[in-house]
Amino acid sequence: MSLSPGPLTPHGGGFSTWHAYDPSCKAELWSTCFSSNQGTVLFDPINWPKGTPLPAAPVRIVRTNGNHDRSCAELAARTEGQISATVPGFTALPLPGAGEGETAFFHLPSGTWVVGDALIHLAPHGLMPLPDKYCTNPALLRQSLRRLLDLPIRRIFFAHGDPILQDGLERIQKLFP
């Protein structure tokens, strides 16, 4: 993958994002970074922003689904990081019905949810579930997303779209009245 992402954008609480448009899939690809005193987690990473120091070790790299290889292997090599399906301090939330292996990650202390393709937040449509044509089972995905309505979600970081930095749960509830 050879993209030219913009700089890291900090969002507080250790979370940052970076993104770039990928002409091969005609979509804006977003990546999320979480940094703490225990190390760094990169969710669905695309190319690391040029001119930005590499993240602090230890580095854990997480794919939210089977389609998000992106720059995982390259960044694992550059940072001596580990590609992993688990993240200490985050709850893994499988979301059957989206793409293969779709799993979101919830960080309870900050009320932050990191999601791959199950929900997208792109103009001009705004927040919406993954379109049916990309789902393995659209009805099951909607059922999976409804389970999240019990979580105290404040912020949402996406693999496709601008983050929602407040009132995350309220935004999801509007999708499932």
Model feature map: region roles:
Residues 88-91:
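Extracellular/periplasmic metallocenter environments
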Residues 2, 6-9, 13-17, 22-24, ...:
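Metallo-beta-lactamase
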Residues 47-86:
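Active-site metal-binding motif and surrounding structural segment of the metallo-beta-lactamase
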